[in-house]
């Protein structure tokens, strides 16, 4: 799976992971939420089970709590289905309708947010208050070769960056000055959202553990939505000046 915090892609070639799992008779499960079936098809690459948060990019409007899990093996699929029905995990008809509605526009939303995200990542790379930027299609991305092999030209909509001033105080100033961008540990909405892994998704780790992962107090994750790129850069320009 792609990394929730860093937005980096597969650290090892998936073909190697598939071979290892087959050798050890282990089922390979891939979380495809960040990349979606539009950019990557795990089963075609050898995965046995795929999970995806429909709440995020697929439905795309932050108004459903839904996900799916599907397996290659029909017996495994039957076990999953029986468990869901037995434990009452079936979603409401209304949520299913909302998700189906979102799927109608998913291809358009994906292409638009991905295109904006790439331009946005390049903009951040030139900002004097930003120390580093992680986006899969940037040539300086640590996993650039694996990205091209796994995702082709797709970079998807997630951008991560780190402030030059890596203190919590600078991070707080930045967030307070960033108007019109929701501060929320979610992703995939039509509106751009910002999250701070050190105080949200990775808050349960020690500081040393976070630093090992490359997550400092100045590290942020952006889920790029459907706004015009000029609107995003203007807002981030103003906020970054306060760091």
What are these regions (language model features)?
Residues 87-88, 177-186, 239-243:
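A common structural junction motif
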Residues 1-10:
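Single conserved hydrophobic/aromatic residue that forms the stacking wall/gate
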Residues 11-49:
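Catalytic PLP-binding core of fold-type I/II PLP enzymes
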Residues 84-163, 167, 171, 178:
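Structural motif of enzymes handling amino- and sulfur-group chemistry
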Residues 14, 165-169, 176, 192-243:
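PLP-dependent enzyme catalytic core of the Aspartate aminotransferase-like
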Residues 43, 47-98, 102-106:
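Active-site PLP attachment segment
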């Amino acid at each position: 799976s792609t990394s929730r915090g860093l937005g980096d892609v597969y650290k090892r070639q998936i073909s190697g992971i598939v071979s290892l799992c087959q050798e050890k008779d282990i089922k390979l499960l891939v979380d495809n939420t960040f990349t979606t079936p539009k950019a990557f098809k795990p089963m075609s690459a050898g995965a046995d089970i795929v999970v995806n948060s429909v709440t995020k990019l697929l439905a795309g409007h932050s108004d459903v709590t839904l996900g799916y899990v599907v397996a290659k093996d029909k017996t495994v699929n039957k076990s999953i289905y029986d468990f869901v029905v037995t434990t009452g995990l079936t979603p409401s008809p209304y949520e299913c309708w909302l998700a189906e509605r979102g799927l109608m526009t998913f291809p358009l939303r994906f292409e638009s947010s991905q295109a904006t995200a790439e331009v946005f990542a390049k903009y951040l790379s030139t900002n004097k208050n930003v120390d580093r930027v992680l986006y899969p299609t940037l040539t300086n991305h640590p996993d650039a070769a694996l990205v091209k092999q796994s995702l082709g030209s797709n970079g998807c909509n997630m951008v991560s960056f780190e402030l030059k001033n890596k203190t919590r105080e600078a991070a707080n100033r930045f967030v307070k000055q960033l108007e019109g961008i929701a501060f929320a540990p979610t992703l995939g909405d039509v509106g751009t959202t910002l999250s701070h892994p050190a105080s949200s998704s990775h808050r349960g780790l020690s500081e040393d553990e976070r630093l090992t992962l490359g997550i400092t107090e100045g590290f942020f994750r952006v889920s790029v939505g459907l706004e015009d790129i000029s609107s995003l850069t203007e807002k981030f320009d103003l906020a970054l000046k306060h760091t």
